[in-house]
């Protein structure tokens, strides 16, 4: 619930503030997880009032990776390299634009691979 209002789980939003060509604020609202995350440039990132950070995982064998638009990736020259990487991972998922970026911000995923990223995907 946000501000006392209960939101349907499928509703989700990511909002970013761009000032003078620089991102200064990002907000990710994920009612499906009951979470609200935000980050301010130079001030860190927060999830429901507690400090968060991306995952510290440093070994491929422990890495959880989420992908987006594998069809576009499969049509490019990096497909074979991606295929060689997959067996080395702990897990491979395909959560999709909103969900995998939200999970990445709170450290629940280690890596996101998108073959056609645009600013709307990553701004928040």
Segments from the language model and where they lie:
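Acidic donor-binding loop at a coil-to-helix junction in glycosyltransferase catalytic cores
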Residues: 120
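Acidic beta-strand-loop-alpha-helix segment within the catalytic core
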Residues: 14-102
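Alpha-to-beta junction loops
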Residues: 106-111
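N-terminal subdomain of lithium-sensitive/metallo-dependent phosphomonoesterases centered on the IMPase/IPPase/PAP
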Residues: 1-11, 80, 84
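Glycine- and other small-residue-rich loops at beta-strand/loop junctions that grip anionic moieties
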Residues: 93, 114-115
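Hydrophobic residues within well-ordered alpha-helices
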Residues: 102-105, 123-124
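Short secondary-structure boundary segments
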Residues: 69, 115-117
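A generic structural signal for short coil/turn motifs at secondary-structure boundaries
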Residues: 3-4, 73-75, 114
């Amino acid at each position: 619930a946000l501000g006392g209002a209960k939101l349907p789980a499928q509703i989700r939003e990511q909002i970013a503030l761009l000032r003078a060509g620089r991102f200064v604020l990002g907000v990710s609202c994920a009612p499906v997880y009951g979470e609200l995350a935000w980050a301010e440039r130079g001030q860190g990132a927060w999830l429901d009032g507690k400090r968060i950070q991306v995952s510290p995982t440093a070994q491929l064998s422990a890495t959880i990776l989420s992908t987006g638009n594998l069809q576009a990736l499969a049509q490019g020259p990096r497909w074979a390299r991606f295929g060689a990487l997959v067996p080395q991972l702990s897990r491979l998922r395909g959560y999709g634009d909103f969900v995998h970026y939200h999970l990445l911000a709170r450290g629940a995923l280690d890596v996101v691979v998108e073959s056609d990223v645009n600013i709307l995907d990553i701004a928040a």
